[in-house]
């Protein structure tokens, strides 16, 4: 790791966060506003200031962007950071998301037809899947170009071979539902950007909310993308009996909203 003052030059910050009850409570607290001022309360609690505040506190002088794409925020932040590194806009980057539930005005609420499971358990891709559960978490990656990391002797935990971003537009059954076509395109484009074929895959970490609608659509999109591949052959030419695992960490930590990527 790096101490803030020893961070690589031009370190960018690409992060996003979920709205919190704490921010709402602090923003409407007249005593707090009287103590430090309404503007300071907003700066310290409003998620739009997250990236520049981190850059300021750590003394990082690269691009600083607060990203907001709902549940895909943290993964979109990683994509933007990767692109910035490849374009030479920064030499290192912090990328990720945060969702922390602190002050709760009510307990766990389930209602018929909603996204939350009736028993408070999330079971992605399971026959008993009936919904997701809210979760809290922070996920941040320190990203560098591989050649720079190796040259400086940095520990390399993983290599990002390729990323892609798409958007469903109106091509889905509802605003909060995923769409098959653009999810398929995102997977295919990511494989192409990585210069790899689906046959190389051993495991897929999916969004996997544990909802009947979302899991089914995600499985269909992954199946379509893996069947086609980038060479038209797909994962099927791995050989008969081959399998690709699929799962989601939400079964352990729940849906972390802006940090779910």
Model-derived segments and spans:
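Condensing-enzyme catalytic core of the thiolase-fold
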Residues: 1-261
């Amino acid at each position: 790791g790096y101490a803030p003052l020893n961070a690589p030059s031009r370190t960018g910050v690409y992060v996003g966060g979920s709205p919190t009850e704490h921010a709402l409570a602090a923003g409407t607290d007249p005593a707090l506003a009287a103590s430090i001022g309404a503007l300071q309360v907003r700066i310290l609690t409003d998620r739009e200031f997250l990236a520049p505040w981190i850059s300021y506190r750590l003394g990082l002088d690269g691009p600083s962007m607060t990203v907001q794409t709902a549940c895909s925020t943290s993964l979109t932040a990683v994509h933007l950071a990767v692109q910035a590194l490849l374009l030479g806009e920064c030499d290192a980057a912090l990328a990720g998301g945060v969702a922390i539930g602190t002050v709760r005005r009510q307990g766990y609420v389930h209602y018929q037809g909603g996204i939350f499971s009736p028993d408070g358990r999330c079971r992605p891709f399971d026959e008993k899947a009936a919904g997701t559960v809210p979760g809290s978490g922070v996920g941040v990656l320190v990203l560098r170009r591989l050649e720079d990391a190796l040259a400086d002797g940095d520990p390399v935990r993983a290599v990002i071979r390729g990323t892609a971003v798409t958007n469903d537009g109106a091509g889905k059954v509802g605003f909060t539902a995923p769409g098959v076509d653009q999810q398929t395109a995102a997977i295919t484009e990511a494989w192409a950007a990585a210069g790899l074929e689906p046959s190389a895959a051993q495991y897929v970490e999916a969004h996997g909310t544990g909802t009947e609608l979302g899991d089914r659509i995600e499985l269909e999109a992954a199946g379509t993308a893996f069947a086609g591949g980038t060479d038209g052959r797909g994962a099927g030419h791995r050989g008969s009996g081959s399998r690709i695992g699929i799962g989601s960490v939400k079964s352990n930590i729940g849906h972390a909203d802006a940090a779910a990527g």
